[in-house]
């Protein structure tokens, strides 16, 4: 269980932030290979995760390829995952798992060590699904588009 001590919420939360960073890095990799009018430069890499996801969804939609249906679903799943990440990382987590949002009108909730570990694993799995889709579907599609353009 990620080597955490019983009741330790901080170590699993560290894995949430680590896996979220790797997931965002994989999204950056996807955006760097998707065809776009303007290159995916360092300015765009500084965008919020929500903006990156919207941009990636738009670029994938513009390709109009049924081979990318799975990728569309993966990108859609990410919005909820990163919203949960924001709640955990930007909220105030107290002993016993009491989580208070910094947003007005959001109620307090409880999270356990197991909840946080499970969520870290969901982020890791999402990143792996995105990587597989990029390698299996996006790269071959982009390569064939370049070949058609060069012909």
Task: Give the residues covered by each predicted segment.
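Amphipathic alpha-helical interface elements
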Residues: 1-58, 72, 76-83, 87-90, ...
